[in-house]
Amino acid sequence: MGQEKNMMDSLQLDYRIVDTFEDLQRVAEGFETQRSVAVDLEADSMYHFQERVCLIQMASRNLSVVIDPLKIGDLSPLRSVFENPRIQKIFHGADYDVRSLYRDFSFNINQMFDTQVACRFLGIRQTGLDAVLQERFGIRLDKKYQKKDWSRRPLPPEMIEYAAKDVLYLHPLSKILQAELKEKNRLSWVQEECQSLSRVRPAENGGAPLFLRFKGAGRLNRRHLAILEALLQFRRHIAETLDRPLFKVIGNHALMRIAVEKPASLKDLEDSRALSPGQFRMYGRGIVEAVCRALTAPDAELPVYPRTKTAPVSPEIALRVKALKSRIENLAESLKLDASVLCPRALIGTIATANPVNIRSLKALPDLKNWQRKTFGHEIVTVLNDLKGKNKR
Protein backbone atom coordinates (compact mmCIF):
# COMPACT_ATOMS: atom_id res chain seq x y z
CA MET A 1 0.00 0.00 0.00
CA GLY A 2 3.05 2.30 0.32
CA GLN A 3 3.09 3.48 -3.28
CA GLU A 4 -0.69 3.87 -3.28
CA LYS A 5 -0.54 5.88 -0.03
CA ASN A 6 2.08 8.22 -1.50
CA MET A 7 -0.14 8.74 -4.52
CA MET A 8 -3.02 9.80 -2.26
CA ASP A 9 -0.85 12.07 -0.12
CA SER A 10 -0.06 14.13 -3.22
CA LEU A 11 -3.76 14.87 -3.77
CA GLN A 12 -5.19 18.14 -2.55
CA LEU A 13 -8.83 19.13 -2.37
CA ASP A 14 -8.71 22.16 -4.66
CA TYR A 15 -11.97 22.79 -6.48
CA ARG A 16 -14.19 25.62 -7.62
CA ILE A 17 -17.93 26.06 -7.92
CA VAL A 18 -19.42 26.52 -11.38
CA ASP A 19 -22.83 28.21 -11.34
CA THR A 20 -23.00 30.26 -14.56
CA PHE A 21 -23.39 29.17 -18.17
CA GLU A 22 -20.33 31.14 -19.24
CA ASP A 23 -18.13 29.49 -16.62
CA LEU A 24 -19.52 26.09 -17.58
CA GLN A 25 -18.51 26.71 -21.19
CA ARG A 26 -14.94 27.44 -20.12
CA VAL A 27 -14.84 24.37 -17.88
CA ALA A 28 -16.17 22.13 -20.66
CA GLU A 29 -13.51 23.44 -23.03
CA GLY A 30 -10.87 22.60 -20.43
CA PHE A 31 -12.18 19.06 -20.00
CA GLU A 32 -12.19 18.57 -23.79
CA THR A 33 -8.38 18.55 -23.73
CA GLN A 34 -8.18 15.81 -21.07
CA ARG A 35 -7.81 12.06 -21.52
CA SER A 36 -10.04 11.26 -18.53
CA VAL A 37 -12.59 12.99 -16.31
CA ALA A 38 -13.95 11.63 -13.02
CA VAL A 39 -17.68 12.15 -12.45
CA ASP A 40 -20.08 11.93 -9.51
CA LEU A 41 -23.41 13.54 -8.74
CA GLU A 42 -25.80 14.35 -5.92
CA ALA A 43 -29.58 14.20 -6.26
CA ASP A 44 -32.61 15.00 -4.10
CA SER A 45 -34.64 11.77 -4.31
CA MET A 46 -35.39 11.78 -0.57
CA TYR A 47 -36.90 15.26 -0.54
CA HIS A 48 -38.95 15.81 -3.70
CA PHE A 49 -41.54 14.04 -5.83
CA GLN A 50 -39.50 14.27 -9.02
CA GLU A 51 -35.88 13.70 -8.22
CA ARG A 52 -33.35 15.95 -9.91
CA VAL A 53 -29.60 16.08 -10.29
CA CYS A 54 -28.58 18.86 -7.90
CA LEU A 55 -24.79 18.81 -8.24
CA ILE A 56 -22.35 17.33 -10.73
CA GLN A 57 -18.79 16.88 -9.54
CA MET A 58 -16.17 16.52 -12.26
CA ALA A 59 -12.40 16.36 -12.04
CA SER A 60 -9.51 15.93 -14.43
CA ARG A 61 -5.96 15.60 -13.19
CA ASN A 62 -5.58 19.38 -12.96
CA LEU A 63 -9.13 20.75 -12.72
CA SER A 64 -11.83 19.93 -10.16
CA VAL A 65 -15.27 21.56 -10.23
CA VAL A 66 -18.64 21.32 -8.51
CA ILE A 67 -21.32 22.24 -11.05
CA ASP A 68 -24.69 23.61 -9.93
CA PRO A 69 -27.29 22.54 -12.55
CA LEU A 70 -30.14 24.08 -10.56
CA LYS A 71 -28.61 27.53 -11.03
CA ILE A 72 -27.28 27.08 -14.56
CA GLY A 73 -30.19 25.21 -16.11
CA ASP A 74 -28.63 24.68 -19.55
CA LEU A 75 -25.82 22.14 -19.29
CA SER A 76 -25.40 21.64 -23.04
CA PRO A 77 -21.66 22.55 -22.96
CA LEU A 78 -21.05 19.27 -21.10
CA ARG A 79 -22.62 17.16 -23.84
CA SER A 80 -19.45 17.09 -25.91
CA VAL A 81 -17.45 15.96 -22.86
CA PHE A 82 -19.77 13.07 -22.00
CA GLU A 83 -20.20 11.97 -25.61
CA ASN A 84 -16.55 12.30 -26.67
CA PRO A 85 -15.15 8.75 -27.03
CA ARG A 86 -11.58 10.03 -26.63
CA ILE A 87 -12.27 11.16 -23.05
CA GLN A 88 -12.68 8.39 -20.49
CA LYS A 89 -15.40 9.18 -17.94
CA ILE A 90 -14.64 7.56 -14.58
CA PHE A 91 -17.56 6.71 -12.26
CA HIS A 92 -17.99 4.50 -9.22
CA GLY A 93 -21.33 2.70 -9.28
CA ALA A 94 -22.47 4.38 -12.50
CA ASP A 95 -25.91 2.82 -12.98
CA TYR A 96 -27.88 5.50 -11.09
CA ASP A 97 -25.72 8.34 -12.42
CA VAL A 98 -26.05 7.26 -16.05
CA ARG A 99 -29.83 7.02 -15.75
CA SER A 100 -30.05 10.39 -13.99
CA LEU A 101 -27.83 12.23 -16.48
CA TYR A 102 -29.93 10.89 -19.34
CA ARG A 103 -33.24 11.66 -17.61
CA ASP A 104 -32.40 15.26 -16.73
CA PHE A 105 -30.08 16.30 -19.57
CA SER A 106 -30.35 13.61 -22.28
CA PHE A 107 -26.61 12.98 -21.96
CA ASN A 108 -25.23 9.83 -23.57
CA ILE A 109 -22.02 8.53 -22.00
CA ASN A 110 -19.33 7.29 -24.37
CA GLN A 111 -16.10 5.67 -23.13
CA MET A 112 -16.96 5.02 -19.49
CA PHE A 113 -14.97 3.23 -16.80
CA ASP A 114 -16.77 2.16 -13.63
CA THR A 115 -14.37 1.47 -10.77
CA GLN A 116 -17.04 -0.54 -8.94
CA VAL A 117 -17.41 -2.90 -11.90
CA ALA A 118 -13.62 -3.13 -12.02
CA CYS A 119 -13.55 -4.16 -8.35
CA ARG A 120 -16.02 -6.98 -9.00
CA PHE A 121 -13.87 -8.32 -11.83
CA LEU A 122 -10.84 -8.28 -9.54
CA GLY A 123 -12.66 -10.45 -7.01
CA ILE A 124 -13.09 -7.66 -4.45
CA ARG A 125 -16.07 -8.46 -2.22
CA GLN A 126 -16.77 -5.08 -0.63
CA THR A 127 -17.17 -2.75 -3.62
CA GLY A 128 -18.67 0.38 -2.07
CA LEU A 129 -16.41 3.39 -2.58
CA ASP A 130 -15.87 3.87 1.14
CA ALA A 131 -14.78 0.23 1.59
CA VAL A 132 -12.53 0.28 -1.47
CA LEU A 133 -10.78 3.53 -0.50
CA GLN A 134 -10.26 2.27 3.03
CA GLU A 135 -8.79 -1.02 1.81
CA ARG A 136 -6.63 0.57 -0.89
CA PHE A 137 -5.57 3.86 0.63
CA GLY A 138 -6.58 3.75 4.30
CA ILE A 139 -9.08 6.56 3.68
CA ARG A 140 -12.50 6.78 5.33
CA LEU A 141 -15.17 8.84 3.61
CA ASP A 142 -17.45 10.91 5.81
CA LYS A 143 -21.01 9.97 4.76
CA LYS A 144 -22.93 12.25 7.11
CA TYR A 145 -24.19 14.42 4.24
CA GLN A 146 -25.16 11.56 1.95
CA LYS A 147 -28.88 11.80 2.74
CA LYS A 148 -29.12 15.56 3.06
CA ASP A 149 -31.29 17.76 0.84
CA TRP A 150 -28.98 18.64 -2.04
CA SER A 151 -31.59 20.90 -3.63
CA ARG A 152 -31.39 23.52 -0.87
CA ARG A 153 -29.70 26.77 -1.76
CA PRO A 154 -27.33 28.09 -0.68
CA LEU A 155 -25.56 24.86 0.17
CA PRO A 156 -23.30 25.02 3.23
CA PRO A 157 -19.59 24.99 2.32
CA GLU A 158 -19.07 21.72 4.19
CA MET A 159 -21.66 19.96 1.97
CA ILE A 160 -20.00 21.25 -1.19
CA GLU A 161 -16.62 20.07 0.10
CA TYR A 162 -18.12 16.65 0.90
CA ALA A 163 -19.42 16.41 -2.67
CA ALA A 164 -16.06 17.41 -4.16
CA LYS A 165 -14.12 14.74 -2.25
CA ASP A 166 -15.54 11.63 -3.92
CA VAL A 167 -14.21 12.44 -7.40
CA LEU A 168 -10.84 13.42 -5.95
CA TYR A 169 -9.93 9.76 -5.46
CA LEU A 170 -11.35 8.25 -8.66
CA HIS A 171 -8.36 9.01 -10.89
CA PRO A 172 -5.71 7.24 -8.75
CA LEU A 173 -8.15 4.41 -7.98
CA SER A 174 -8.95 3.96 -11.66
CA LYS A 175 -5.26 3.92 -12.60
CA ILE A 176 -4.48 1.17 -10.08
CA LEU A 177 -7.52 -0.96 -10.96
CA GLN A 178 -6.93 -0.72 -14.70
CA ALA A 179 -3.32 -1.81 -14.22
CA GLU A 180 -4.43 -4.84 -12.19
CA LEU A 181 -7.10 -5.74 -14.73
CA LYS A 182 -4.57 -5.49 -17.53
CA GLU A 183 -2.19 -7.76 -15.63
CA LYS A 184 -4.97 -10.36 -15.29
CA ASN A 185 -6.08 -9.89 -18.94
CA ARG A 186 -9.50 -8.72 -17.79
CA LEU A 187 -9.44 -5.07 -18.82
CA SER A 188 -11.36 -5.77 -22.03
CA TRP A 189 -13.99 -7.60 -19.95
CA VAL A 190 -14.64 -4.54 -17.83
CA GLN A 191 -14.56 -2.22 -20.83
CA GLU A 192 -17.32 -4.22 -22.49
CA GLU A 193 -19.36 -4.35 -19.29
CA CYS A 194 -18.98 -0.57 -18.93
CA GLN A 195 -20.04 -0.02 -22.51
CA SER A 196 -23.22 -1.97 -21.80
CA LEU A 197 -23.76 -0.08 -18.53
CA SER A 198 -23.41 3.27 -20.29
CA ARG A 199 -26.59 2.49 -22.25
CA VAL A 200 -28.95 1.94 -19.30
CA ARG A 201 -31.96 4.25 -19.25
CA PRO A 202 -34.56 5.31 -16.67
CA ALA A 203 -37.55 3.01 -16.43
CA GLU A 204 -40.73 4.49 -17.89
CA ASN A 205 -44.15 3.68 -16.51
CA GLY A 206 -45.90 4.28 -19.85
CA GLY A 207 -49.34 4.50 -18.24
CA ALA A 208 -49.11 1.01 -16.76
CA PRO A 209 -50.87 0.34 -13.44
CA LEU A 210 -48.84 1.49 -10.45
CA PHE A 211 -49.40 -1.82 -8.65
CA LEU A 212 -47.05 -3.52 -11.13
CA ARG A 213 -44.14 -1.98 -9.22
CA PHE A 214 -45.59 -2.61 -5.78
CA LYS A 215 -44.11 -5.51 -3.83
CA GLY A 216 -46.77 -8.02 -2.79
CA ALA A 217 -49.45 -6.82 -5.22
CA GLY A 218 -49.43 -10.16 -7.01
CA ARG A 219 -50.85 -11.87 -3.90
CA LEU A 220 -54.03 -9.74 -3.86
CA ASN A 221 -57.38 -10.66 -5.36
CA ARG A 222 -58.86 -8.41 -8.04
CA ARG A 223 -60.97 -6.29 -5.66
CA HIS A 224 -58.08 -5.68 -3.29
CA LEU A 225 -55.89 -4.94 -6.30
CA ALA A 226 -58.36 -2.27 -7.45
CA ILE A 227 -58.24 -0.69 -3.99
CA LEU A 228 -54.46 -0.74 -3.97
CA GLU A 229 -54.30 0.93 -7.40
CA ALA A 230 -56.75 3.63 -6.26
CA LEU A 231 -54.62 4.24 -3.16
CA LEU A 232 -51.42 4.39 -5.19
CA GLN A 233 -52.95 6.90 -7.59
CA PHE A 234 -54.16 9.00 -4.65
CA ARG A 235 -50.72 8.94 -3.02
CA ARG A 236 -49.03 9.87 -6.28
CA HIS A 237 -51.37 12.85 -6.73
CA ILE A 238 -50.71 14.09 -3.18
CA ALA A 239 -46.94 13.59 -3.52
CA GLU A 240 -46.83 15.50 -6.78
CA THR A 241 -48.98 18.31 -5.38
CA LEU A 242 -46.86 18.67 -2.24
CA ASP A 243 -43.58 17.94 -4.08
CA ARG A 244 -42.67 15.17 -1.67
CA PRO A 245 -41.30 11.68 -2.32
CA LEU A 246 -43.95 8.98 -2.17
CA PHE A 247 -42.64 7.38 1.02
CA LYS A 248 -42.93 10.70 2.88
CA VAL A 249 -46.67 10.83 2.15
CA ILE A 250 -47.77 7.30 3.09
CA GLY A 251 -45.56 4.22 3.31
CA ASN A 252 -46.09 1.04 1.31
CA HIS A 253 -46.86 -1.07 4.37
CA ALA A 254 -49.74 1.24 5.34
CA LEU A 255 -51.17 1.19 1.81
CA MET A 256 -51.10 -2.60 1.65
CA ARG A 257 -52.81 -2.85 5.02
CA ILE A 258 -55.56 -0.45 3.92
CA ALA A 259 -56.02 -2.32 0.63
CA VAL A 260 -56.53 -5.59 2.51
CA GLU A 261 -58.75 -4.21 5.30
CA LYS A 262 -60.68 -1.93 2.85
CA PRO A 263 -62.06 0.60 5.38
CA ALA A 264 -65.18 2.18 3.89
CA SER A 265 -65.58 4.96 6.48
CA LEU A 266 -63.40 7.36 8.41
CA LYS A 267 -64.15 5.42 11.59
CA ASP A 268 -63.07 2.14 9.96
CA LEU A 269 -59.88 3.78 8.75
CA GLU A 270 -59.12 5.28 12.15
CA ASP A 271 -59.80 1.95 13.87
CA SER A 272 -57.38 0.19 11.51
CA ARG A 273 -54.54 2.35 12.86
CA ALA A 274 -52.81 2.02 9.52
CA LEU A 275 -52.05 5.75 9.50
CA SER A 276 -50.43 8.10 11.96
CA PRO A 277 -52.73 10.76 13.47
CA GLY A 278 -51.19 13.35 11.17
CA GLN A 279 -51.69 11.22 8.08
CA PHE A 280 -55.27 10.44 9.07
CA ARG A 281 -55.99 14.13 9.54
CA MET A 282 -54.47 15.15 6.20
CA TYR A 283 -55.36 12.24 3.93
CA GLY A 284 -58.08 10.22 5.67
CA ARG A 285 -61.03 11.52 3.66
CA GLY A 286 -59.25 11.09 0.33
CA ILE A 287 -58.21 7.55 1.23
CA VAL A 288 -61.73 6.51 2.18
CA GLU A 289 -63.06 7.97 -1.06
CA ALA A 290 -60.45 6.02 -3.03
CA VAL A 291 -61.36 2.80 -1.21
CA CYS A 292 -65.08 3.32 -1.81
CA ARG A 293 -64.59 3.98 -5.52
CA ALA A 294 -62.73 0.71 -5.87
CA LEU A 295 -65.28 -1.17 -3.76
CA THR A 296 -68.15 -0.06 -6.02
CA ALA A 297 -66.36 -0.66 -9.32
CA PRO A 298 -68.08 -3.32 -11.50
CA ASP A 299 -66.45 -6.73 -11.48
CA ALA A 300 -65.75 -6.46 -15.20
CA GLU A 301 -63.60 -3.36 -14.60
CA LEU A 302 -61.43 -4.84 -11.87
CA PRO A 303 -57.74 -5.12 -12.74
CA VAL A 304 -56.00 -8.43 -13.24
CA TYR A 305 -52.43 -8.93 -12.12
CA PRO A 306 -50.53 -10.23 -15.16
CA ARG A 307 -49.09 -13.70 -14.73
CA THR A 308 -46.13 -14.65 -16.83
CA LYS A 309 -46.65 -18.17 -18.05
CA THR A 310 -43.34 -19.93 -18.21
CA ALA A 311 -43.09 -23.27 -19.90
CA PRO A 312 -41.94 -26.02 -17.55
CA VAL A 313 -38.23 -26.70 -17.81
CA SER A 314 -37.60 -29.98 -19.57
CA PRO A 315 -35.36 -32.59 -17.93
CA GLU A 316 -32.85 -32.07 -20.75
CA ILE A 317 -32.59 -28.32 -20.11
CA ALA A 318 -32.35 -28.90 -16.36
CA LEU A 319 -29.38 -31.21 -16.95
CA ARG A 320 -27.70 -28.60 -19.14
CA VAL A 321 -28.24 -25.91 -16.51
CA LYS A 322 -26.72 -28.13 -13.84
CA ALA A 323 -23.69 -29.01 -15.98
CA LEU A 324 -23.09 -25.42 -17.10
CA LYS A 325 -23.51 -24.08 -13.58
CA SER A 326 -20.93 -26.56 -12.27
CA ARG A 327 -18.42 -25.65 -14.99
CA ILE A 328 -18.92 -21.89 -14.48
CA GLU A 329 -18.50 -22.24 -10.71
CA ASN A 330 -15.26 -24.18 -11.17
CA LEU A 331 -13.94 -21.59 -13.60
CA ALA A 332 -14.97 -18.72 -11.31
CA GLU A 333 -13.21 -20.38 -8.38
CA SER A 334 -10.01 -20.73 -10.40
CA LEU A 335 -10.22 -17.02 -11.31
CA LYS A 336 -11.15 -16.06 -7.72
CA LEU A 337 -14.35 -14.41 -8.92
CA ASP A 338 -17.97 -14.69 -7.92
CA ALA A 339 -19.72 -17.01 -10.38
CA SER A 340 -22.48 -14.42 -10.93
CA VAL A 341 -19.85 -11.95 -12.19
CA LEU A 342 -18.60 -14.47 -14.71
CA CYS A 343 -22.01 -15.64 -15.90
CA PRO A 344 -25.32 -14.73 -14.19
CA ARG A 345 -27.78 -17.57 -13.55
CA ALA A 346 -30.33 -16.12 -15.98
CA LEU A 347 -27.74 -16.25 -18.74
CA ILE A 348 -26.92 -19.86 -17.89
CA GLY A 349 -30.61 -20.64 -18.37
CA THR A 350 -30.64 -18.85 -21.71
CA ILE A 351 -27.60 -20.79 -22.91
CA ALA A 352 -29.04 -24.11 -21.72
CA THR A 353 -32.30 -23.44 -23.55
CA ALA A 354 -30.57 -22.40 -26.79
CA ASN A 355 -28.19 -25.38 -26.58
CA PRO A 356 -25.54 -23.98 -28.95
CA VAL A 357 -23.54 -26.64 -30.76
CA ASN A 358 -20.54 -24.50 -31.73
CA ILE A 359 -18.93 -21.09 -31.24
CA ARG A 360 -20.85 -19.66 -34.17
CA SER A 361 -24.10 -20.60 -32.43
CA LEU A 362 -22.93 -18.73 -29.33
CA LYS A 363 -22.70 -15.53 -31.36
CA ALA A 364 -26.44 -15.71 -31.91
CA LEU A 365 -27.08 -15.24 -28.17
CA PRO A 366 -27.48 -11.46 -27.68
CA ASP A 367 -27.04 -11.59 -23.90
CA LEU A 368 -23.67 -13.33 -24.12
CA LYS A 369 -20.95 -10.71 -24.33
CA ASN A 370 -17.86 -11.02 -26.49
CA TRP A 371 -15.53 -11.37 -23.52
CA GLN A 372 -17.61 -14.24 -22.15
CA ARG A 373 -17.69 -16.02 -25.49
CA LYS A 374 -13.92 -15.66 -25.90
CA THR A 375 -13.13 -16.61 -22.29
CA PHE A 376 -15.29 -19.68 -21.78
CA GLY A 377 -17.25 -20.16 -25.00
CA HIS A 378 -15.36 -23.34 -25.89
CA GLU A 379 -16.05 -24.74 -22.42
CA ILE A 380 -19.77 -24.06 -22.84
CA VAL A 381 -19.87 -25.85 -26.18
CA THR A 382 -17.79 -28.75 -24.83
CA VAL A 383 -20.08 -29.23 -21.82
CA LEU A 384 -23.21 -29.22 -23.98
CA ASN A 385 -21.75 -31.52 -26.64
CA ASP A 386 -20.56 -33.95 -23.95
CA LEU A 387 -24.12 -34.12 -22.64
CA LYS A 388 -25.41 -34.83 -26.13
CA GLY A 389 -22.89 -37.64 -26.48
CA LYS A 390 -23.98 -39.19 -23.19
CA ASN A 391 -27.65 -38.99 -24.15
CA LYS A 392 -27.01 -40.82 -27.42
CA ARG A 393 -25.48 -43.81 -25.69
Task: Report residues per predicted region.
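Accessory DNA-binding and partner-docking regions appended to nucleic-acid-acting proteins
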Residues: 157, 167, 173-393
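Short beta-turn/strand-loop junction motif enriched in small, turn-promoting residues
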Residues: 42-46, 274-276
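Helix N-cap/beta->alpha junction signal
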Residues: 20, 93-94, 251, 344
